[in-house]
C-alpha cells in the first residue's frame, strides 16, 4: 500500500490489516491525494464481498469479483508514457480502474465507441484531476480505446494527442499520451 500512498492517502497497519486515513500530528486528516480514490477504496474494503486479485494475467481483465492484472501490460504502459506521469496507468490507477468493473465497484463497462470514454474512465478522470490540482501530472484520459497508429497504439491524455488521432497525423511535441504494444 505504501507505493500508492500519494493517490489514496491511506495506510495499512500490518499485521491487523486495518486501514487508516493518514493524519497530521494533531490527528486531523491530511487533505492530500485523491479524496474520490480514498473514499472509493474505503467503500471497497468495507464491503463484505471478497475480490480475488491475480497478478499473472496475460492481459488485465475483470469479471464479477475477479481482477486479473498483467504485470507486463501495466509495466509497458508506465514505460510508454509521454508528457504524463507513467503512474497515470500504473498499478494503483489500473487497480482502481478495474475495481469499477467488479460487482461491488459498480459493474461498469468501458466504452465500445472508437472515440469515447465511458463511466469508468470518467470516474478515473475525477481522481486524475484531483491529483493534478496537487501538482501531479496524471493528465486526463480522453479516450478509452488505444488507437492503432504507425507510431504504435496510442491512448490520448490531452487534446493535442486526441486531435492527432482523429486526423490520423503524427503525435506533435505538445501531445500527452501513453503508447502501448
Sequence positions of predicted segments:
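Walker B catalytic acidic pair
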Residues: 98
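Long, low-complexity, intrinsically disordered regions
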Residues: 15, 26, 47-58, 69, ...
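Active-site or metal-binding loop neighborhoods of secreted/extracellular toxin and effector enzymes
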Residues: 103-181
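Extended hydrophobic/Leu-rich segments
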Residues: 22, 32, 41, 53, ...
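Active-site scaffold of zinc-dependent metalloenzymes
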Residues: 45-92, 102-106
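An amphipathic, basic-hydrophobic helix/alpha-beta surface used to engage anionic
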Residues: 95
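Intrinsically disordered, low-complexity segments enriched in small/polar residues
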Residues: 15, 25, 31, 62, ...
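A metal-dependent hydrolase signature that marks the N-terminal structural subdomain at the beginning
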Residues: 1-54
Amino acid at each position: 500500500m505504501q507505493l500508492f500512498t500519494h493517490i489514496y492517502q491511506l495506510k495499512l497497519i500490518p499485521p491487523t490489516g486495518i486501514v487508516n486515513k493518514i493524519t497530521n500530528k494533531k490527528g486531523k486528516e491530511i487533505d492530500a491525494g485523491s479524496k474520490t480514490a480514498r473514499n472509493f477504496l474505503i467503500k471497497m474494503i468495507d464491503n463484505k464481498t471478497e475480490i480475488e486479485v491475480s497478478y499473472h494475467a496475460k492481459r488485465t481483465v475483470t469479471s464479477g469479483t475477479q481482477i486479473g492484472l498483467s504485470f507486463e501490460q501495466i509495466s509497458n504502459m508506465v514505460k510508454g508514457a509521454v508528457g504524463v506521469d507513467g503512474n497515470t496507468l500504473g498499478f494503483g490507477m489500473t487497480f482502481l480502474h478495474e475495481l469499477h468493473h467488479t460487482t461491488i465497484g459498480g459493474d461498469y463497462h468501458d466504452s465500445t465507441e472508437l472515440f469515447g470514454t465511458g463511466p469508468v474512465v470518467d470516474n478515473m478522470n475525477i481522481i486524475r484531476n484531483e491529483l493534478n490540482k496537487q501538482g501531479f501530472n496524471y493528465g486526463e484520459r480522453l479516450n478509452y480505446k488505444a488507437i492503432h497508429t504507425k507510431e504504435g497504439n496510442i491512448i490520448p491524455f490531452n487534446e493535442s494527442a486526441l486531435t492527432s488521432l482523429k486526423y490520423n497525423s503524427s503525435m506533435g511535441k505538445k501531445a500527452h499520451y501513453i503508447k502501448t504494444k
